A protein has these predicted regions:
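Conserved nucleotide-sugar phosphate-binding/catalytic loop shared by glycosyltransferases and other
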Residues: 34-80, 155-158
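Short, polar loop motifs at secondary-structure junctions
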Residues: 34-40, 114-118, 204-207, 280-286
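Donor-nucleotide binding loops and adjacent catalytic segments primarily
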Residues: 203-311
């Protein structure tokens, strides 16, 4: 079986697909990952063949671009959809051409993220199966609202309808440029978004129970990750961990555009007297501004680091949310945009996180109260139970089996 995976997003979006590709290769299949050049390092480390898609995701997420403004305003759906569509629309024709070239001779194309619509178009052009994949559960259900809408916005009665609304709005934002790219390859215009295709999710059924009303072609396989190779921490990190009690981890991944000075001030005040590991990521926060109880760190494997922490303060991306839960430690979530509000609520419902802290108006008191709840025995015990269940999952292996069945059908 030969598959290619086409996705576009941050490094955190690409990393699970690198793990999935490695799992496919270990099962005797061919796999190749297509993504932004800056997000392919994890695939290369795993020996996964890669092809770069046009674009500059890190530059696009910088503080002077539209998506940063969306974050600053609080992640409204319409603004988010337009800002994200702008990224894909600028590259639609190039992406479609690259995916078609890489996909010649393949059995199926897995599509995700901002490359999904052109990915399905490439599968149509090549006459192969298009399979949706990802870490955000977008298959319609009455169990929960669309992950792209803050849960508190949607009355339960409208959960099912919210998915159709979001799909229609997303397609409206992507449609014209997607159809223009399709026309370059003599494909007819699409009037509506793709539906009815198989979906494979790198999502834990222990964190998000499988909805009873999902179709048979939607699969929750568990988190996609491969255990990090033997990893040695830098001396500064090793010494810090050995010098005292388990620290608090703070990191907001690829998020930019928020009021980082205000947020950092609130965190520094709330963390007074505590040991803290701080990962600046793409935030633009200067590590020189950190007090002595903070240690700034670089990229560190979450599966190595998080079990050594007392709690994880993060933005609520699917990958970080899963990794913290899998490590058996509580989370404190400060969501900014997109599906981050959804994962903040899933962690709260699972009993492993307090209510989310507002990142637009961060207050030290809010972080202090959340940290008291997160480090209390009840939440720590619940996190340990959930972590044990998630570590027993075989997310990559389950996804490989599901894909084998889908392609063979």
């Amino acid at each position: 079986m030969k598959l290619i995976v086409a996705t576009y997003g941050t490094e955190g979006d690409a990393r699970p697909f690198a793990a999935l590709c490695r799992g496919l290769m270990d099962a005797g299949h061919e796999a190749r990952l297509l993504a932004d050049a800056a997000t392919l390092d994890s695939a290369r480390v795993l020996g996964v063949p890669t092809t770069a898609l046009a674009g500059d995701i890190r530059g696009t997420l910088g503080s002077d671009h539209a998506i940063a403004g969306v974050v600053a305003k609080g992640g409204g759906f319409n603004d988010t959809a337009r800002a994200l569509a702008k990224i894909a629309n600028q590259n639609a024709e190039s992406w479609l051409r690259t995916i078609i070239e890489a996909g010649r001779g393949c059995d199926a194309i897995l599509v995700a993220g901002l490359a999904a619509f052109v990915g399905f178009s490439a599968a149509e052009y090549l006459g192969v199966k298009g399979i949706g994949a990802g870490m955000i559960p977008i298959t319609p259900t009455a169990t929960f609202p669309s992950p792209f809408l803050p849960p508190k916005w949607v009355p339960r009665l409208f959960n099912g309808a919210s998915h159709g609304f979001v799909n229609a709005m997303l397609w409206r934002a992507f449609r014209d440029k997607t159809n223009a790219a399709r026309a370059m390859f003599k494909l007819p215009p699409r009037k509506a978004v793709w539906t009815g295709h198989p979906m494979v999710y790198g999502v834990s059924p222990n964190l998000l129970p499988m909805p009873a009303d999902w179709p048979a072609n939607a699969h929750l396989s568990g988190q996609w990750l491969v255990r990090s190779p033997v990893w040695m921490p830098p001396p500064a990190l090793a010494n810090f961990l050995a010098a005292g009690e388990a620290p608090i981890y703070i990191g907001f991944g690829s998020m930019t555009g928020f009021d980082n000075t205000r947020l950092l001030d609130a965190l520094i005040e709330a963390m007074a007297g505590r040991r803290v590991l701080f990962y600046p990521g793409w935030s633009g926060i200067d590590p020189k501004a950190l007090p002595d109880n903070f240690l700034a760190i670089g990229d560190t494997p979450h599966d190595w680091l998080f079990p050594r922490t007392a709690a994880v303060i993060h933005h609520g991306g699917s990958g970080t949310s899963h990794s913290a839960a899998r490590a058996g430690v509580p989370s404190i979530v400060t969501p900014f945009a997109g599906d981050q509000f959804f994962w903040a609520e899933r962690l709260r419902l699972a009993g492993v996180a307090p209510a989310a802290v507002d990142g637009r108006r961060p207050k030290a008191e809010a972080f202090s109260s959340a940290l008291d709840l997160a480090t209390a025995a009840r939440m720590r015990n619940r996190a340990q139970v959930l972590g044990e269940a998630m570590r027993a999952e075989s997310g990559v292996a389950n996804a490989v089996v599901a894909l084998e069945r889908i392609v063979a059908s």
